[in-house]
């Protein structure tokens, strides 16, 4: 072979080998990048979210949205005016104390000092956070760790399980069970814990139990005796209690809200969560707080100072002023804490009546602004929608499409083992204007007409 031809062949082979090496290296780089771009294990399997799924579906303005728990009634004018006034003060548009703006924590110590019947240190026993979510997250990150177990009562607010898992702990679930066999007149009080079952969930690994009262989504207010039973187990097993009480002021006639932290032996082991959004109907402000003993709160403060650091100053100033205004009116008709509950009680009763007229079975809540309803009696055939989702998910999607009415499936608030118990229930929100409830009533009245 001519030397020139041989050189050409050798050159071609070299180019081919070089190209293959580059491709192989590029492939290795891609695989390495894929591994490094993978999610952290602590969020594995936590990407599904009922709010993301149903908020977009219900975004059509023609749909009457009773799904998400936000008010479409106006907040108190003095709270909005307080924000406008705060924004006009230059220093209140800058950073404030990271653990809570002085005006707000002092106001909280006054209001809750009266509620707890104890003096609260505004700077050591209260932490202001970004909503109730921030309070719960700070609590989990500060006090729960890998290998711990946290007891969660079903149905639960959906962020509890992901937050426990992100802390490296194991959620241990126990359901409320319906004790009444009646098909009408069911109350949230008819949903109870089996005390033997509850006791069986506590062991040496149990770090905490989460109590939500009034409960979202059922609206159950845990009675003093029910809370005492939980407290006894906490004390026996040296367990913490995380008490989510964001609906604490929305208590309807004939019922009493008891703070588990006020029971003997519970203050030193309880973190109580509160919310400005729920207190003053300003959910978009995203302000919440944790109240508890100094030896626990300081750990939450550590999380706060190394994550979010602080909350918006003018919002905190406005909420603080609002709390002080209503503190002076506590026990009087003009106090917003109690006035809102009176307003919502009528809306609750109206919603229960119109759901019952349609053939559904409402569970009338003792507190909060949600109502779950059993849709079993409607006998809606949804077999055409497949069997890859629980019945309530399919029912809500069908109802949004066919009836233009949005709700939330209750199995979004339970674990896999309790799906069958809750899949015929949907959750509706009634902190809505009369015009919104009018539109919902029109849909329900015409339910069987097409």
UniProtKB/Swiss-Prot annotation:
One of its GO terms (biological process) is biosynthetic process. SUPFAM superfamilies: PLP-dependent transferases. The modification N6-(pyridoxal phosphate)lysine is found at residue 278. Catalyzes the irreversible transamination of the L-tryptophan metabolite L-kynurenine to form kynurenic acid (KA), an intermediate in the tryptophan catabolic pathway which is also a broad spectrum antagonist of the three ionotropic excitatory amino acid receptors among others. May catalyze the beta-elimination of S-conjugates and Se-conjugates of L-(seleno)cysteine, resulting in the cleavage of the C-S or C-Se bond. Belongs to the class-I pyridoxal-phosphate-dependent aminotransferase family. PANTHER family: FI04487P, KYNURENINE--OXOGLUTARATE TRANSAMINASE 3. This is Kynurenine--oxoglutarate transaminase 3. It comes from Danio rerio.
């Amino acid at each position: 072979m001519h030397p020139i031809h041989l050189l050409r062949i050798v050159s071609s082979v070299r180019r081919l080998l070089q190209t293959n090496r580059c491709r192989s290296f590029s492939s290795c780089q891609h695989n390495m990048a894929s591994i490094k771009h993978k999610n952290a294990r602590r969020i594995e399997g936590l990407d599904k979210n009922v709010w993301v799924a149903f908020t977009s579906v219900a975004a059509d303005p023609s749909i009457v949205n009773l799904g998400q728990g936000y008010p479409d009634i106006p907040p108190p004018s003095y709270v909005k005016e307080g924000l406008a006034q705060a924004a006009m003060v230059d220093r209140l548009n800058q950073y404030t104390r990271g653990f809570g703006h002085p005006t707000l924590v002092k106001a909280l110590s006054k209001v809750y000092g009266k509620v707890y019947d104890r003096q609260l240190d505004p700077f050591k026993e209260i932490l202001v956070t970004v909503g109730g979510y921030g309070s719960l997250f700070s609590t989990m990150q500060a006090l729960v760790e890998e290998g711990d177990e946290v007891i969660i009562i079903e149905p639960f607010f959906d962020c509890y399980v992901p937050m426990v898992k992100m802390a490296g702990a194991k959620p241990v679930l126990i359901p409320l069970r319906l004790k009444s066999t009646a098909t009408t007149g069911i109350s949230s009080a008819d949903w109870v814990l089996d005390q033997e079952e509850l006791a069986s969930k506590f062991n040496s690994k149990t770090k905490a139990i989460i109590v939500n009262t009034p409960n979202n989504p059922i609206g159950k207010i845990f009675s003093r005796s029910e809370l005492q039973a939980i407290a006894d187990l906490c004390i026996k097993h040296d367990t913490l209690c995380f008490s989510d009480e964001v609906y604490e002021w929305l208590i309807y006639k004939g019922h009493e809200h008891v703070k588990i932290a006020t029971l003997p032996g519970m203050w030193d082991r309880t973190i109580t969560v509160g919310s400005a959004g729920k207190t003053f109907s300003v959910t978009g402000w995203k302000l919440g707080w944790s109240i508890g003993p100094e030896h626990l709160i300081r750990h939450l403060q550590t999380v706060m100072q190394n994550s979010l650091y602080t909350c918006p100053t003018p919002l905190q100033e406005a909420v603080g002023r609002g709390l002080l205004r209503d503190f002076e009116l506590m026990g009087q008709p003009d106090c917003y804490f109690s006035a809102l509950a009176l307003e919502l009680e009528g809306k609750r009763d109206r919603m229960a009546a119109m759901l019952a007229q349609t053939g559904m079975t409402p569970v009338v809540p003792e507190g909060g602004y949600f109502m779950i309803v059993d849709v079993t009696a409607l006998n809606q055939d949804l077999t055409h929608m497949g069997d890859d989702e629980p019945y309530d998910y399919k029912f809500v999607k069908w109802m949004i499409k066919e009836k233009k009415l949005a709700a939330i499936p209750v199995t979004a608030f339970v674990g896999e083992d309790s799906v069958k118990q809750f899949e015929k229930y949907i959750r509706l929100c009634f902190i809505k204007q009369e015009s919104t409830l009018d539109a919902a009533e029109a849909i329900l009245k015409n339910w069987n007409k097409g």
